């Protein structure tokens, strides 16, 4: 239902029973009452988790995130400490509309609509350039059976090159590619906190392993996760969109166990998809094309996939974090 509030806030309480739509609300930014804190519409309170979390994560249209305090006082719930930073970084103006899509945990994807009634991208995340310092950081593919079309971009040409393997951009791969086989991988040679394999960057902040294969990566990706201790990997829009690849090396390094079906979790809700496990331990998850289409991914977007595991350490879901125009900003 829609309920207009005295502070020009409104809320749309979309049911999650179908699993297709996440709850959301919208508000109008008024500087005199929303510059340092923002009240959440009362009509939305029954959808807030209980007990009320102390903090929430706001994810902007440009891929950045803000941690804000959630407080309850005088029977109202507010975004407080940290909200002022969100306002300043996104340069919010009087009368602009903001929509908040809740993921059911603690994150809200926030969209901003300017005076022209169009969704705007603001506070774009900066993507750092990382060069490979040693020959060990170059990877080559020795067997065609290890090549996935997932690693091919839309603008690929017909020549041979080495693949740098953090999230692939459209001009980073040309034709036939080379990547190191799993048998050549030596964990003890990896110096710090992430492992990058085939078209993905793999990150686990709790380990001390890192390998840099791709020149571009999202800076500090674990900061954007629901749980910074979760394993995650980075990918992008590719020609082969019908399945999402979880590389064998990632599965081996973190002992990932996949159930026969997992859920994608994005701003539209949950989508259950079938997993296919290969002999070399790589895992493919179908219905990825639907995720790409309903989120309208472009070649300039980067996608951070957060792996969610249950108490038995079995993977049950992939949480999608979208970084709009991240590649274009480099």
UniProtKB/Swiss-Prot annotation:
It comes from the Eukaryota. Pfam families: B3. Keywords: DNA-binding, Nucleus, Transcription, Transcription regulation. Residues 129-138 have a biased composition (Acidic residues). The keyword DNA-binding applies. Residues 142-162 have a biased composition (Low complexity). Residues 129-169 are annotated as: Disordered. GO terms for molecular function: DNA binding. The keyword tRNA processing does not apply. It is found in: Nucleus. CDD domains: B3_DNA. InterPro entries: B3_DNA-bd, DNA-bd_pseudobarrel_sf, Plant_B3_domain. Residues 23-116 bind DNA. One of its GO terms (cellular component) is nucleus. PANTHER family: B3 DOMAIN-CONTAINING (PTHR31920), B3 DOMAIN-CONTAINING PROTEIN REM21 (PTHR31920:SF54). This is B3 domain-containing protein REM21.
């Amino acid at each position: 239902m829609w309920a207009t509030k005295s502070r020009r806030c409104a809320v749309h309480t979309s049911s999650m029973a179908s699993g297709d739509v996440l709850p959301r609300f919208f508000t109008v930014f008024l500087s005199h009452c929303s510059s340092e804190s923002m009240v959440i519409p009362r009509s939305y309170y029954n959808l807030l988790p209980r007990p009320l979390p102390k903090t929430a994560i706001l994810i902007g249209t440009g891929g950045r995130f803000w941690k804000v305090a959630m407080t309850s006082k005088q029977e109202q719930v507010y975004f407080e400490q940290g909200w002022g930073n969100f306002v300043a970084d996104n340069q919010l103006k009087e009368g602009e509309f903001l929509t908040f899509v809740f993921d059911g945990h603690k994150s809200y994807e926030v969209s901003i609509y300017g005076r022209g009634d169009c969704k705007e991208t603001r506070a774009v995340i900066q993507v750092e350039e990382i060069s490979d310092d040693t020959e060990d950081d170059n990877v080559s593919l020795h067997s065609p059976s290890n090549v996935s079309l997932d690693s091919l971009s839309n603008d690929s040409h017909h020549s041979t090159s080495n693949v740098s393997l953090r999230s692939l951009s459209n001009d980073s791969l040309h034709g036939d590619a080379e990547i190191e086989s799993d048998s050549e991988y030596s964990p003890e040679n990896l110096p710090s906190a992430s492992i990058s394999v085939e078209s993905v960057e793999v990150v686990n902040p709790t380990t001390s392993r890192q390998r840099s294969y791709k020149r571009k990566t999202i800076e500090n990706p674990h900061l954007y996760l629901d749980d910074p201790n979760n394993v995650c990997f980075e990918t992008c829009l590719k020609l082969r969109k019908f399945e999402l690849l979880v590389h064998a090396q990632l599965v081996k390094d973190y002992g990932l166990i996949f159930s026969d079906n997992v859920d994608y979790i994005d701003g539209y809700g949950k989508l259950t998809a079938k997993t296919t496990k290969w002999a070399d331990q790589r895992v493919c998850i179908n219905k990825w094309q639907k995720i790409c289409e309903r989120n309208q991914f472009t070649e300039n977007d980067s996608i951070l996939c957060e792996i969610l595991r249950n108490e038995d350490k079995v993977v049950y879901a992939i949480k999608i974090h979208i970084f709009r125009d991240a590649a274009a900003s480099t």
